[in-house]
Amino acid sequence: MTGKTWLIIPAYNVDKYIDTLLFQTVCYIPPERTIVVDDGSSDLSGEIARKHGVQVIVHSNNKGKGRSLRDGLELVMQNGGDWAITIDGDCQHDPAKIPAFLSAGESDKYDIIIGNRHRSGTKMPWDRKLSNMLSSAVISVVTGQKIDDVQCGYRMIRISELKDFEFKAVSYDFETELLLKMVRKGARIGQVDIPTRYNGEASSIRRMRDTIRFIKLVSLYLIRRI
């Protein structure tokens, strides 16, 4: 059973999107179990989120998506949550797929469920697609579990699997670190097909820097340091 499921939304300068997103997510996860992490935004992201009655964590400066997710997960653990769904704050992920994640969690077959954008017919920018395919292939090989879209931030995580974990990553590599730590512990991975709506804005992922961080994480996993 999915029990108490929470929603975590990392938000950085998304005041154009956060209002619409929260109007949609409330259909599936109540405001009191929704956490928006305002990661040092210079716009009105946090103020708009508060109007929806959700819990808002504010960073005084931009600390990175990984730190936002870590802080959100810690709050879910403190409140005795069973699961956490993570969804980006820029409306690229469709909240209407939340029931599909909940259903996968209800099956009790998985400990982490990851969105898969590749079978939805969505046209992903070629550079993101290439990077994603390569990193997904590497993670699938080293973990022994097939993962089609390892870079997807739309996920559902069983909170009990995170007990005693210590994380170091604070940027986008946090999602890879979390996945590798969970697999090391024996986590079962599920996938849900999702569409993605690209809004035309440049990705905040820095390819070279994040590729180096990815290689480092995989290397640490292989020598059993993760």
Give the label of every model feature segment.
Residues 4-6, 177:
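Cell-envelope/extracellular polymer assembly enzymes that use nucleotide-activated donors
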Residues 13-27:
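Short, well-formed alpha-helical segments that are part of the catalytic scaffolds
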Residues 14-17, 41, 94:
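Donor nucleotide-sugar binding loop of glycosyltransferases
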Residues 17-20, 43-51:
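Acidic helix N-cap motif at the loop->helix transition within catalytic regions
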Residues 38-46, 91:
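A conserved acidic beta->alpha catalytic loop
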Residues 59-78, 95-172, 198-219, 223:
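Acceptor/aglycone-binding surface of glycosyltransferases and processive sugar-polymer synthases
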Residues 81-90:
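Short beta-strand-to-loop acidic/aromatic patch adjacent to the donor-nucleotide binding site
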Residues 146, 168-170, 180-197:
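Catalytic donor-sugar/metal-binding loop of nucleotide-sugar-dependent glycosyltransferases
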